[in-house]
Structures are given as structure tokens and as C-alpha cells.
């Protein structure tokens, strides 16, 4: 904007009437400029006091003067008339160009006006100073807000008072003002709402109102937001006089909620004083805070709230926000109750919950879900986001108006855990946004025993939220009404702008980290003050009694009423005989299981398809279904090759995946594929999103053009995050069993940055929380000389975490043995060697009557390997996933002549067959591929061993001996054959790194393992 600098510029010859007419015609509604009135010719240096953001106020006055010179103070009238006449705005500024003789006479006639200029300059400078003062409070007022309920610490680590905040009258000198200016009246700029209906206020009142808005029990951080509308919205919410008013009914409701929150913790302390419960004492206001957010969101149309939180206060939230039956909570404290045979279970302050009820404030139905989580702080954040995104997707809530998420955090974890940053950066990505999350930080100003000054480098624990321009509302938790107002504004912000917002509840922790911990060892001064601190319930009750809102008997009756509720629930809890984890399910799947939670059958239909369907999908996969769409020439060749494969009734890896996905879409199964570069594929094999070479950002997804009324296909390149994105996809898969949700690592090696999600959620999730999940992990794996970080998906780690017993041979004659195995396992681990088998295992994942995580070690070089092809015949009706692919060559025709039976999995099979052919040993060595590693195919492998009675057994792998599959396979193979024979090893030696970075060394190691595999005398010295 040109701002008022142009006032001192040389003017076009306009009459006053022409000036007003031009202004009224051209003045924009929001952004204003003088460009349509003046020629901007004066250099900026000539009028520095009129430049920058300080010009806003002068600009307002100037527009008012143009419309009616009498509407402004006489001093402003003098200033603008002098400026328009060409007089210099001050002795410090350069004069404009000389005036024409006619204009000079006009200046002469206005002599008294020019003489008044020095006073005008002072007035303008004072007004600009006041505007700067207002802005200083808006930017830095939170630094001096009274946020710590203990009054001994600063909520931010920077304890210095900003120089531009008026903490004493001598600070007025910073702005060129003094005490004599305090009673002067100043016009208020449009960037503040402290005036309410008044457009001007005395300086004393301006400072008082700014202190009330920004320096009391609420500190607002928002001026880093680069959106004027959003900043103005926040200013209005916190600056408008009298905006934080509550009715007596609202105050009574707040008191009742505080009673429930406080008395619940006290009840648990009385009954189980020696039990860990991670109570909420010191931040009891959290419960009414959450209920306020939910109430306001429900009022704005939200009917489903998904929550995630750590252990602190979790039982209280379950009881008083989610409304879990109190007796079910109390049962968790009974050490005599036996657990149902449903899994290993989890501690009570990790459990989740799902509940649908009526919101009493809005009288609307609302569903509340608290996601179960491990002790790993903040790990559940992306899981909650993913589940929220899924629920929005399934109900068509494209703007987040029906489903929302609330995340609770601790101050130390919010600042310290990197997953918080990863999750924030998903918040505005098109395929990951949940259209705004309300974050509530329980800031008890300590992390276990660690002082905040040792726990973070930023002033506040919430500073990470600034990266996504989320407003941050700090509030003193001992002021319940301030907390309620902030939470109401947070809910309104989310409803209005659909962006993240943070509420920082600055509180304290009355006990130690848990109820058994002694905090005085490390925080003696803090806890001396805490011992003196009056509980917030008592403070607020005394306030309301003094205000006449309630009387003492009413308050005591509220306490007695809730105490009675707790006692009655405690009595009912004694009737419970067994603990059921299923009572704590956070993501039920209505209709998928029987009423008692069992699969509706224990069979799986054929995963094959008719040739017509295969051909149709293949034709779409090899074409562009949109007209006037120009694809890359190289991609044209790829599609042409696909078309030729389809004509030859053959599929490669990319086509097999396409056919599996396309057929499930036809059956109404939503498919979501996510990960880094998955749209094209890291190895440029997938190409599920086509890009027009002539039109920027124009894309086509052929998979969404397969069938009329098909389910939608979502394929989305993720941010460069594994931990956050895998957690997100896990949460997405929680919402419905009728979706195939896949996460692909760029290379399998990189999954370990998401190890927490794998170790704490995917592997033990069902055992801990009775929560099935069908997520699929695609992990590119293979030793191909690409170095230690592009070779191994660490299969040994996944296999180590499988829950089957290597020393126990199951009942192989059991009906539906393979399905029962799948039902009993904690996850399925496969390494397919053919595209056809890959096709089948993807389809089986949905056709099974239950859900298990599926870990697939996918190939890299096999994607284009000429032998890694499957015929349509392997994918027709009646076919299915092959857990084991037996030898089908000459060795199988004469099994008595076979000297060695090699077991392997994955890509190494093609190295072995090539070497066997080169050595002409096709009749002496049989090769059996184990495609499904877990659950282990005992039954099929026993048949293979019995087929070759004279053969010695060896396991061959390309991975190092202490890695890969050997330590998992060997004991199970030995159990299969009742330890009748040894199982030898042919592979690389043990190593610390997964692979060498030297190509020659890689090839040498490969040849050595092949030599061992086909040297029939290799193991004689070990017999």
C-alpha cells in the first residue's frame, strides 16, 4: 500500500469535490490505497513517520477528512490541508517540489495553518506511538500475563519484561510519551477492538484495557499468523470489553463439573491410596475445559469427537467426559479380579473407550471415542488424526463439520517429542488434513522430575504449533472462567477456520509423577508452594458464594450427590467376577463380527477372478481414460508394455497390484495407498497417477475409472515422515474393516523410524486392546548391492515379534488349519516371489472374516525381472494364495534322486534357479519357496520334507546369518520334522550392517552363498 506517504507527494490538480468523489467511487472495502487519488512521487525517506504499519491510523483519519473535513479534530484538518497545499510535513522531512504561483498564494492564505504544523507533527507522532503500543501488547502481552497459578515461575522461560510493554509509567518514554499524555484522548486504529463502541479513548484507559485483554490470566499468541481476517477475529474475541461474561447458570454448570473432576480424584485416593492412577490434581479444570470444547463443537454441528491423550488424568476423562461406567473403572483397581482370556490387556490408564450419548447442553447426539495408547508419549497423535480422517471420509464430511479431533498433551512431551512436529505438518496436507484439531496442553510445568529449563529451548512448550500458524491461548488454570472462555474460543476457531488451535493450561501437579513418587527430592520449593495452594474447586466455590451465584448448602449438596454416585458405583463393581478388555474397545465395527465379537465364519473364499475382470482391469491399467490428456512418452511405452502383457494373459508386479486393487474397488472396498512417492512408485513401476504434460497440475487416476459405482481409490504421496504417516494410516484402518489401507516405505530400511508404531500398536494392538486392524505394510526389500540403507526391511525383527511357539507343532489335522492359524497370530508376514501370489494375498486380506496386520516384503529388481511373471491361469476362480510354492521341475518328478532340499523365500529363489541351471543340478537339488513366513506353514512343509526322504535340508537366504529369516525358520522346520534332521545354513556370514556398500563385495558374497547352496559336500564336516 502507498499509505499516507502520498499525502506529502506532489498532487494532481483536483478540487475538493473531485477528491471526495474519486475517493467514494474507488475506495476498496478492505485493502485501501491512495493510488487512485494521488501520483506517488515523493521518496519514502521524505516521510518516514508515515511509512510501515504505523500509517494505518493516519490513513483512517485521512479518509474520514476526505469525506467530511469537519468529522476530524481541527488539528487533523490543519495537517491535511497543509499537506494538500504542499507544505512539508515537518522540518525533518524533505520539502516537495516547488508549488506553482497559484498554489503559493493559497499557502500564503493558509499561513496560520502552516504555522501550526509543529503541534500537528507531535499529535501525529503520539497517535502513531499509541498504535505501536497497541501492537506491542498484541504481540508480546502474553510474556507478562499472570499465567502461573503458583506465582513462582513464568510460563515462558524468558522472564524479562519486553521493553515496549507499559509495566510502569516510566516505560511511556519508549514511545515518546509521558504521564501528562495519560489523559489525552487518542483515536483507535482498525486493528484493535478495545474501544468497543467507542472510536477514541484516553491513553490511560487504552493501557488498562490492553492489560485486561493480554496481561491477566490469558496470554494470546497469534500475531505470527499471516492472515488479517484470522488476526482480526482473535483480536475481537479477546479485546472487546465485557466479552468474557458468564451467566449464573453457566457458572453453576462450571462449578458442578469442577466438583465431579475433583471429587473423582479424591474418591480414588481414598479407596486406592497406594495405586498408580496418574491423577489430575492440580489441573482439575481440564474436565470442564474439555466439556466446554465438546459443547461448543456440538452446538456448531459436530456429532463425533475422537480424542487422544496420555496417562495424566485419563481415568477422570473416561469417567466425566466420555462417561464410561464408573464401576468398570473401579474394577480395574481390583487386583483379585481375573482377566478374561482375550489377550494380555493393558494398564487402566492406557485403555480406550467408545460411547454415544446425548450432550446435555445442546440436546444433540454425540459420539466420543478415546483412542487407546501406549506409554510412549504423543505416539497416539497421528493415530487419532488418521481415525478422524477416516470417519470424515466415510460420512462424506469433506470440511470437517461433523467429525473432529481433540488431542491432549503434557508440556514436556509436547516440546520434546518429534512426532508432535510430524503430526502438525500433516494438518494442512490435502490427503491428511482433519480440518483442524483442538490441542490441549496440560502444562504442569514439570516433566517427571525435569525442570522446564532443562526440557526445552523455546520460551513455551507450545512453540512447535507456530509452524502451522496455529493460535496459542495460554491460560491460568486456577481461573476456571478464563479457561472456559479460552476453550469456547478454541472450539469456535476450529469451527470457523478449520485449522489447528492450542490451549495451554498452565497448572501444577499436586502429587509426584505418580501417587507413589516423592517430588520434594527434586522440586522442593515448587512443592512447598503447592502444599500451600488452595484447590481450584475451593477457590471457585468461595467466589461464587461471595457473588451470590450459589450458597454454601447448594455447593455441599453438589459434592454429596457426586460422592453418592461414586459410592454406588463402587458397590456395583464388587459384583463383577471377571475383567473384560472388550468393554474398553475404542473402535467397534458394528455388523462385522457376531454379537459376542467372533468372526462370522472361519473360511476364506477363493481369491481368484474371472478372466473378463482381469482383462478389463488390465486394459484400463494400460490406457488413459480421459480425453485430451497428454502423458509422457516414456509412460506411453510403459502402458503399451502393460497392454501387451494383458494380451498374452500375463501380469508383472505392477499389473498384479492393479488387478487386486481394481477388483476390490468393484466389490465396494475403499483402498487407500499412502507413503513417500507412492503415486508413481519409488522404482517408477506403479504410475497410478498420470500427469498431463501440457497442463500444470492436471492429473488422472485411471483406477477411479474402472467401474460404475465403484468404491473410491485414494493414492497419496505423503510428507517425508514415517512415524507420523504410518501412525496416521494405522488410525485410518481402525475406522472400518471394509477398507484396504496400505502404507509403503520408500525402502523397507526406513520403516524403523516408525518403529514405535510397529512395536506399540501394530504388533501387540489386538492383544492389549482387543482391537483388530487390517493395515498392510509394503516394505521394499532385497540385497542388490545398494548399500546398508537400501537393502533390508529387517525381516528378522518382524519375525521375532510373531506370537507362535517355534517348539510346538500344532494340530495339522484341524479343520481350516490355515485360517485358524491366521486368526490366532498377531500379524501375517509374507515374502512373495510371484506377482500372482502378491495379487492373492492382497485380496485375501479383505476376504478373510477377520483382520490382521499384513507385512509384505516387496521386491525391487523383481519388478522388471523377465521371470517374475504370472499367468492369468494362476489368478482365475478357484485359485488362492500359496503359502508354500513347492518344487515343480525335474527334481519333483524323481524325488528319490534329490540330494538336497533348499528352502528359501523371496528374490533369492531366482538366483538359486539360475545357478542350479548353470550347474546342471536340476534333478539333484529341489527348491521350495516359503511365501508365508508367519503363521508358519508347518503342514505344507512337512509334506515337502516327506516327499524327498533322501535329501538333506538347508535354508538359503541372501541376508546375513544373524539377520533375515534363518533364526525364525530353523527351529520351526526342526519342529516340523521332529528334529529328525539338521537344517543347514547357506547364506552370508553374520554382520553388523545389513549389507555392504561395495558392489564387488556384494557379488562375491552372493557367489559364496550360491557355492554353499549347491556344494553337496559343504556340510559333511559338520555332520
From Swiss-Prot:
The modification N6-acetyllysine is found at residues 401, 970. Its main location: mitochondrion. Residues 1-40 form a transit peptide. Pfam families: 2-oxogl_dehyd_N, E1_dh, OxoGdeHyase_C, Transket_pyr. Its cofactor is thiamine diphosphate; Mg(2+). It is an enzyme of class 1 (oxidoreductase). The modification Phosphoserine is found at residue 100. Thiamine diphosphate binds at residues 312, 411, 444, 446, 676. It catalyses: N(6)-[(R)-lipoyl]-L-lysyl-[protein] + 2-oxoglutarate + H(+) = N(6)-[(R)-S(8)-succinyldihydrolipoyl]-L-lysyl-[protein] + CO2. There is a cross-link at residue 534 (Glycyl lysine isopeptide (Lys-Gly) (interchain with G-Cter in ubiquitin)). Calcium ions and ADP stimulate, whereas ATP and NADH reduce catalytic activity. The keyword Glycoprotein does not apply. The keyword RNA-binding does not apply. Ca(2+) binds at residues 143, 156, 158. 2-oxoglutarate dehydrogenase (E1o) component of the 2-oxoglutarate dehydrogenase complex (OGDHC). Participates in the first step, rate limiting for the overall conversion of 2-oxoglutarate to succinyl-CoA and CO(2) catalyzed by the whole OGDHC. Catalyzes the irreversible decarboxylation of 2-oxoglutarate (alpha-ketoglutarate) via the thiamine diphosphate (ThDP) cofactor and subsequent transfer of the decarboxylated acyl intermediate on an oxidized dihydrolipoyl group that is covalently amidated to the E2 enzyme (dihydrolipoyllysine-residue succinyltransferase or DLST). Homodimer. The 2-oxoglutarate dehydrogenase complex is composed of OGDH (2-oxoglutarate dehydrogenase; E1), DLST (dihydrolipoamide succinyltransferase; E2), DLD (dihydrolipoamide dehydrogenase; E3) and the assembly factor KGD4. It contains multiple copies of the three enzymatic components (E1, E2 and E3). In the nucleus, the 2-oxoglutarate dehydrogenase complex associates with KAT2A. Interacts with ABHD11; this interaction maintains the functional lipoylation of the 2-oxoglutarate dehydrogenase complex. The mitochondrial 2-oxoglutarate and 2-oxoadipate dehydrogenase complexes (OGDHC and OADHC, respectively) share their E2 (DLST) and E3 (dihydrolipoyl dehydrogenase or DLD) components, but the E1 component is specific to each complex (E1o and E1a (DHTK1), respectively). This is 2-oxoglutarate dehydrogenase complex component E1. The gene is OGDH.
